């Protein structure tokens, strides 16, 4: 049969102008109330499609028939009355125009058609709104009765082929229903959710994940996105509009079985969060409802698929967001004269509010957390977000704002004024560590930003208390002759004490315009990511520890990967926590000369410089080995920097000619406290709490000294943005993911070799005597492992020495368990091979600031140290701070609510109930009621609890053949495990006697003994299990060990520790608190 011709969908009532509505009502002489009553019957008496196709083909193609069959059935959840008004209006216009054309084919077909078919045709025809006055009188009683039945089931999916269903009979029954008052039950509806599959998340679990194709139910065409499927359904007419209003007045009409409807109610709330129109925010019960809504309202054309193209004319700010946007600048606006006045913010919001879309409904409150709509939201309030915090100027793009901040230096003023006033900046709350650093003299060294790092970096990087102070001689041969405006130092005295000959270069807007095209996609992606983070933070629903839009973070174009690029220059992302100003100066870096040409396509390798680098590395190794033998441990400066992929400008040329006195501290190889002879005071970075893991994905594969080797920095097309995103994501997820190393990269091989040489040098030299006390030591320890947790304990060295005044980056990690880090204070001359790159240090100090915004409760477990240098002197002197660990790091056994003594009694009773068969296998027999009574009376456990414990044990034994204290029962060779001392016993009788030795009484005496007697016996009894366990030399001294928590005794220290961990859930660190040693008798 030919498919029904599809009429172009109307706009929803929300988009019909008020003048048209008024005109339509005047033409027809109807008020809205009459029309509302009218709309019902028109939807109910739909013309049956199949019968009509045979009976009156010419009528089928007329617009009036299409309107009645398809359009009048549009009582969607949006606005019932206004939708009906729109139906009425368009229907009346069409019917006036084409009444004559419609009636002619009707006369032709009356001869051949039966009386029933004619009734159906005329009823359908009269149900049009053109005949509304007649219709009102003719069908009002029927509509009242039939209201609930036909709309009882809300929408179902779109395929609806059923040969057994009689369309004609159903239509006639509905038409003549006014006659029979007794028929209250509805016809079985073809579109009810019982007969058809719902496209719900339970049946099609993967449909919302993007893993599956979106298929059209009618023609099975597959589409990648829901929008494409919606467009297809619109063009081909492969959908049926079942958006009836649900009838709340008549619950008897509910067509679903009760159990089914309850099951569907479970996931209804979750489904409505997903099945939401991204334009208007309405929720729908099924995917088909959503698709029909999108088709009828054309909303799918209004949702930006990936990125905003043009700003929306009417800026949509829902009323519920007004308060949130008012708070945008308050936390970080400085009180300086240039600060944005608060009044202008509210005025702007009022202006935006007046322009806002009049059709926003209360449901819209959650409409912007969904899909691509965060891009809309960003466009709507771009002027609020992209605003300079210092002078209040708005910008259209992040690039312009960044250029403005760089050129004017406003980011320094904003941060400094906020710090002077003592106001915390939102991204970097002032922690106690900052206050300890205020006394130290600091020189702020802000550095130039590249175009590409701008979206993600925030004022956190500018905090003057975190800036790096570096003492170096710049190699003049390699100095670039461009003009480099020198940064003014804030305190005058600092210029005298710090001999810095570095020059700084701020990017101009012209530089930004010359940026290579390849970086723009990344900029947009990062811009979207930051935008969504802002929106989620304002909405109050951050997830992933501040990275709300994980989907946006991974929607990045596949960039060309350079061998250096995989681990090199990538931007760390920082979400704005409740703050909307994206001020994005780059990481503060020292002594970076500007790139000579920003558009160089490929870095040229200077092999002569590479040879020099190799020579310098080998020389430094030799010097390290010599210096390590000196007792005072003077350190030789390194020439090498190993930046983290989180640092933003890795490839720019770094001039490094360090003097022999002031070196750089390495962040990679071995624990490295500084030497005392250093004079330069430098602020230490805020320590990150124990257990926070900062990921350094390819830390050792690329060195900052590649700048010596490359004439030009690698440009953005060779950046792998996913490595930066992954590293920051992993910080929040607590995972230490290691991306694959570039195997054939000569640079990475070179620096791996130098790392291993330095490590060998550290291990080969015996640790000298510890001549200085621990308080002279810097408490920041580092080692090579990429995935070790951080244990940066707080405190600063007495003389404020850090070699070369380098800011210590919180990425480098110190194992809490390694006390060797202190003893190897003088040994750690491998210092010279650690990273001296201020790039990495500042990038990672920013990330540490971001971590402070996360809750303390998410700290992850510390992993065990694996570097060789740590293992060398594990038993050396200990630091109090190094042994402090957070509760989350402590190893917790399984928490059991059982009293261990009760478990022993139950296990012994169960073992006693095992019966051995003639084949040698054991079978379980139940405990007698008397035995259970004795256990219950003694232990205080209820009979029900005892029965449940026994049933659980039997179930586990039948299902898996073993349980916690008994394995291999089904094989005939059972193994019994003692919970207390981890002994393994082969026979039930031995096991029972062993448990009785722990308990201090025999099970057969259980009924005779009183609780007091048993407790006294337990206290006096010494465990005979000492004979079974082979004692270690430390236990030959005539001691046994008693648990203070339950007064049981054990033969070995290992046994009591095992008992404390398994039974009481105590950490190994706390074992000494709960164990008392007893003299053997």
From Swiss-Prot:
Entry-annotated residues carrying Phosphoserine: 682
Q: Please give the InterPro entries that the UniProt record associates with this protein.
A: HD (IPR001356), Teashirt_fam (IPR027008), Znf_C2H2_type (IPR013087)
DNA-binding residues: 891-961
For bias type Polar residues, the affected ranges are: 335-364, 581-603
Q: Which residues form a coiled coil?
A: 606-630
Q: Which molecular-function annotations from GO does this UniProt entry contain?
A: chromatin binding; DNA binding; DNA-binding transcription factor activity, RNA polymerase II-specific; zinc ion binding
- Name the GO terms of the biological process aspect: long-term synaptic potentiation; negative regulation of DNA-templated transcription; positive regulation of synaptic transmission, glutamatergic; regulation of respiratory gaseous exchange by nervous system process; regulation of transcription by RNA polymerase II
Q: Where are the zinc fingers (C2H2-type)?
A: 214-238, 275-299, 386-404, 976-998, 1041-1064
Which keywords does this chain's UniProt record carry? Cell projection, Coiled coil, Developmental protein, DNA-binding, Homeobox, Metal-binding, Nucleus, Phosphoprotein, Repeat, Repressor, Transcription, Transcription regulation, Zinc, Zinc-finger
Q: Which GO terms describe its cellular component?
A: chromatin; growth cone; nucleoplasm; nucleus; plasma membrane
The cellular location(s) given in this protein's UniProt record come to:
Nucleus; Cell projection, Growth cone
Q: Where is the composition biased (Basic and acidic residues)?
A: 238-247, 473-491
UniProt subunit comment = Interacts (via homeobox domain) with APBB1 (via PID domain 1). Interacts (via N-terminus) with HDAC1 and HDAC2; the interaction is direct. Found in a trimeric complex with APBB1 and HDAC1; the interaction between HDAC1 and APBB1 is mediated by TSHZ3.
Q: Which PANTHER family match?
A: TEASHIRT HOMOLOG 3 (PTHR12487:SF5), TEASHIRT-RELATED (PTHR12487)
Name of the protein: Teashirt homolog 3
Give the species this sequence originates from.
Homo sapiens (Human)
